[in-house]
Amino acid sequence: MRGDSFIWSLTTAASLLYATVESLQVVKRDNPSIVGFDIERFQVAKPVHRDIIAKRASGKTVSQDLDNQTIRAHIDTGSSDLWVNTDDSQFCSSRRSPCREGGTFDSSSSSTYQLVSNDFNISYVDGSGASGDYVTDVIEVGGIQLKEFQFAIGHTSSSPLGVLGIGYEAGEALVSRFGDESYPNLPAALVKAGHIRSNAYSLWLNDLSASRGQILFGGVDTGKFEGKLQTVPVLHTSGGDYTSLVIALTSVGIRTASEGSLDTFPAQPVAVAMDSGSSLSYLPDALAAKIYNSIDAVFDPSNNLAFVPCSMVNDDRKLVFTFSSPQITVGMDELVIDLGPDANGNEATFRDGSKACVFGIAPAGRSISILGDTVLRSAYLVYDLDNNEISIAPTRFNSTVTNIMEIGTGKNSVPDATGVPNAVTSAPITQATGLSGIETGVPGARPTSRGAAPTMRPDVTFGVAAAGLAGAGILFAFM
């Protein structure tokens, strides 16, 4: 996610990130050590219009049963803590009941609940966040128990859903904010308990309209991608620390199906976070401006959003993101996002009356660039935190083929994957800001203010909940 603590850990270290290249070994065994979950979409009922476009109004989430209470939390590779809302928070107990869809946690019902500290505090760039306690309890993951598992509860919160952060332990809020020692978060705890062999997982979000995706801790599903996986290094700070899942984006281009040629936008490599917790993608301002101009998007600076006609969902142009060698090709049907009506039934329109949709790429400003769901849905990704690398392949949308392989240990490559030779190993975190070069589009095509001006920096999303593979879910058991 675009969190303050996440950005702090990067920007205070250096203006450049560096990388080393290693790899992971994936083998198929009779009894593989894999913990997996299907990702299911859900829609928050009757959300306020600003919440539809807010960062965490809904999203890719896992469903968790906390003492027979179902709680949803965002799956987030851009942060590292699991935190959930409590039933006694002022935000969740307000008259509007904003946490009703996501659920809340009542610690008084657990006999194994233990307080660790009162130091939990996390905030995000959009102004949301949570604070409260670090605690331990028993967590059941797909029938596997993790005793004395540490997570956080938000007594104070401004987000209707909690977050399941699965990034580096160094990205935990108590580390980045206070310099305290880290604790084993979910993937690290699964390794420590011997349930998976490596701190690595694969992510298949599937397309925008699909009802299901998949996350596998300790595993890869070769039936969910096309061709070969290609592996690039995660970038580290000048001090050698790995704090975030950031790689080098080396180019962006646009291709039409009719012409076939790739028109690349001139740009230097830039560090981008591969962040499943961000619904939109955020690129350097100058690069965003070039993309907007190429598709005649209309930029609204009051919302930091670009709008396009909703009919562009049928456009045959595709954006191509290159990472030294592997590419993610994204169709307009993944980038054109319909906000739907607001609480008063008004829809975003241009002044000529045509319906306006949000374009799924926004300017990053002075923050780190992020590739969120609008781009990541078109890729199959393997995040290897033990060896500090990410493997990428084109996704196979709506695939029903399953071939799950276990991620082992060591420095051998993944099945059907190769390390990218001479991959870019350093890139600036931020670029110069300013969108003065953006065209306003055709005359009279700027969105109207009624129903079309979001009040918060957006991450437009449709809700996603994760149920366990073969029916197993993430279950918190309190005894």
From Swiss-Prot:
Propeptide residue span(s): 452-479
Location of the protein in the cell: Cell membrane
Lipid-anchored residues (GPI-anchor amidated glycine): 451
GO cellular component terms, semicolon-separated: plasma membrane; side of membrane
Region (Disordered): 435-454
Protein's membrane topology: Lipid-anchor; GPI-anchor
Keyword Lipid biosynthesis in record: no
UniProt EC number: 3.4.23.-
UniProt GO molecular function: aspartic-type endopeptidase activity
InterPro entries linked: Aspartic_peptidase_A1, PEPTIDASE_A1, Peptidase_aspartic_dom_sf, SAP-like
Principal place of residence: membrane
Active site: 76, 275
Pfam families attached to this UniProt entry: Asp
Alphabetical list of CDD domains matching this protein: SAP_like
SUPFAM superfamilies: Acid proteases
UniProt keyword annotations, A-Z: Aspartyl protease, Cell membrane, Glycoprotein, GPI-anchor, Hydrolase, Lipoprotein, Membrane, Protease, Signal, Virulence, Zymogen
Role this protein plays: Probable GPI-anchored aspartic-type endopeptidase which contributes to virulence.
Family, as annotated: Belongs to the peptidase A1 family.
Name listed for the protein in its UniProt record: Probable aspartic-type endopeptidase OPSB
Organism from which the protein derives: Arthroderma otae (strain ATCC MYA-4605 / CBS 113480)
